[in-house]
């Protein structure tokens, strides 16, 4: 650490679940671009609700014209990408209703896109929803919250944690997260 590094401010950003459901490791996503963290590091959620919410305050950078994904830029310079399902681009927007618009500032928990979850379950390859930090190479650390255990404690791991079978088993025992309420990612920049 150099002398000037002492004066650099670090920012911590807590991201809430943008959709209710079961949190899983990003490497379980059935799409190589997400599973290999090419798009960015983060988590995935197997959804149970019908709305995609803003995981934090920020400015909507992009909403795909098919309304299946959006990006959010925070004042701290963190770029978040929320992508509903796998190959849902092929649905040409069917099952998705845009609520917010590109370029607007949103607050944590605001609805960005409404979903017809039953239709999407029937017509998409997968509804697993990756939530990633697109510029994860520019952040100092990422912690993942996989939900709460039976004793109501949060199960949080860092990006340096090796996902052993024991840890994967513990993750599988967590309760589903609630959109707009439960922490899913903590990012330090």
Curated annotation (Swiss-Prot):
Where does this one sit in the cell? Cytoplasm
Question: What does the record give as cofactor?
Answer: Zn(2+)
Native organism is: Borreliella burgdorferi (strain ATCC 35210 / DSM 4680 / CIP 102532 / B31)
An MF annotation (GO) of this entry: metal ion binding
GO biological process, alphabetically ordered: phosphoenolpyruvate-dependent sugar phosphotransferase system
Q: Under which name does UniProt file this protein? A: PTS system glucose-specific EIIA component
- Sequence ranges assigned to domain PTS EIIA type-1 in this UniProt record: 31-135
UniProt cross-references to PROSITE patterns, sorted A to Z = PTS_EIIA_TYPE_1, PTS_EIIA_TYPE_1_HIS
Comment block on domains: The EIIA domain is phosphorylated by phospho-HPr on a histidyl residue. Then, it transfers the phosphoryl group to the EIIB domain.
Subunit structure as annotated in this protein's UniProt entry: Heterodimer with glycerol kinase (glpk).
Task: Name the InterPro entries for this protein.
Answer: Dup_hybrid_motif, PTS_EIIA_1_perm, PTS_EIIA_component
Query: Keyword annotations for this protein?
Result: Cytoplasm, Kinase, Metal-binding, Phosphoprotein, Phosphotransferase system, Sugar transport, Transferase, Transport, Zinc
Residue numbers annotated as active site: 83
């Amino acid at each position: 650490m150099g002398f000037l590094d002492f004066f650099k401010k670090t920012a911590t950003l807590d991201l809430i679940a943008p959709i209710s459901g079961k949190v899983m490791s990003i490497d379980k996503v059935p799409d190589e671009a997400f599973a290999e963290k090419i798009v960015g590091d983060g988590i995935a959620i197997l959804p149970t609700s019908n709305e995609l919410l803003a995981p934090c305050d920020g400015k909507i950078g992009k909403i795909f014209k098919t309304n299946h994904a959006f990006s959010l830029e925070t004042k701290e310079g963190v770029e978040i990408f929320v992508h509903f399902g796998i190959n849902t681009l092929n649905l040409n927007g069917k099952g998705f209703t845009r609520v917010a618009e590109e370029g607007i500032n949103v607050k944590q928990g605001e609805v960005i896109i409404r979903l017809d979850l039953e239709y999407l379950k029937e017509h998409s390859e997968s509804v697993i929803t990756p939530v990633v930090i697109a510029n994860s190479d520019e952040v100092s650390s990422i912690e993942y919250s996989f939900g709460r255990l039976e004793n109501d404690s949060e199960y949080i791991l860092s990006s340096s944690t090796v996902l052993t079978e024991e840890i994967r088993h513990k993750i599988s025992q967590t309760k589903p997260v609630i959109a707009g309420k439960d922490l899913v990612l903590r990012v330090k920049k």
